[in-house]
């Protein structure tokens, strides 16, 4: 708090993790994997929310995955703590069942959890408990992800699919408006990290994404910007086709 700097925290206590990347639940039991319990996240979130409350520090709970952790953050905010929280598109779109379908491309830290957790994350987004949507972009090679589940690295790529999944999972079902999604993905993260949020005004630097909200596109491995293709969303048809990405006035992506 004395330094007036934001603190971002990945919340997992290894003491409550048998094996990372998969939720400790029905899928881990089926695979005899062990898994990472929601308790591993919940105890760390509770600790850091209490510390934020007592110190006045500005804290961000990164890529929240547990419904109980959402409730802990909600309570901390009501008590006056300067606590913020992120959610990723994969955590509000998929559940632990994705591991059975997508294998290592659904292994991540913190892991995908239950449908109840997914719904609680969406509720947290709707009521403002979760105020940022981020990618937790973690590219890995095909060779790395081809390893057995227990030996493969955790994480998926998220840059190309984040906007589309936000539209599909949050806007189209009516949970939030498109403008609210833009705020969660751009304005709020910029403000938390003491950056100047972009604005569409005369003379301002053009930092823009031009897209068709309802235009469909198919996620294809060959369209990813890097060599990594570790995504469970390959083959999905999604809304929000992007035509241009403009950074500091320069076109850096064009379909």
Task: Name every feature range the model reports, one short phrase each.
Residues 148-151, 205-255:
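C-terminal cap of metal-dependent C-N hydrolases
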Residues 17-18, 34, 65, 93, ...:
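Generic, ordered loop/turn and secondary-structure boundary motif
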Residues 13, 66, 89, 139, ...:
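Short, glycine/acidic-enriched loop or turn micro-motifs at the edges of active sites
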Residues 28-31, 87, 103, 107, ...:
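Residue-level signal for pocket-adjacent positions within structured domains
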Residues 79-81, 167, 244:
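Generic alpha-helical hydrophobic packing signal
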């Amino acid at each position: 708090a004395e330094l007036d700097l934001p603190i971002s925290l990945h919340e997992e206590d290894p003491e409550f993790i048998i094996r990372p990347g998969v939720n400790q639940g029905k899928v881990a039991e089926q695979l005899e994997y062990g898994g990472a319990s929601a308790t591993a996240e919940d105890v760390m979130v509770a600790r850091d929310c209490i510390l934020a409350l007592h110190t006045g520090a500005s804290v961000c709970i990164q890529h929240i995955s547990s419904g109980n952790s959402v409730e802990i953050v909600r309570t901390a905010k009501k008590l006056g703590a300067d606590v913020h929280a992120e959610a990723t598109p994969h955590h509000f779109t998929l559940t632990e069942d994705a591991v059975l379908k997508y294998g290592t491309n659904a292994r991540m830290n913190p892991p995908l959890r239950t449908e109840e957790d997914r719904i609680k994350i969406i509720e947290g987004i709707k009521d403002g408990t979760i105020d940022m949507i981020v990618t937790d972009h973690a590219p890995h090679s095909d060779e790395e992800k081809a390893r057995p589940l227990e030996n493969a690295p955790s994480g998926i790529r998220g840059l190309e699919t984040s906007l589309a999944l936000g539209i599909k999972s949050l806007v189209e079902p009516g949970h939030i408006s498109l403008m609210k999604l833009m705020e969660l993905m751009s304005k709020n993260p910029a403000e938390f990290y003491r950056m100047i949020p972009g604005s569409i005004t005369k003379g301002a630097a053009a930092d823009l994404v031009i897209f068709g909200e309802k235009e469909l596109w198919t996620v294809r491995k060959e369209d990813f910007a890097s060599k990594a293709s570790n995504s469970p969303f390959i083959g999905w048809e999604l809304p929000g086709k992007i035509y241009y990405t403009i950074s500091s006035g320069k076109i850096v992506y064009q379909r």
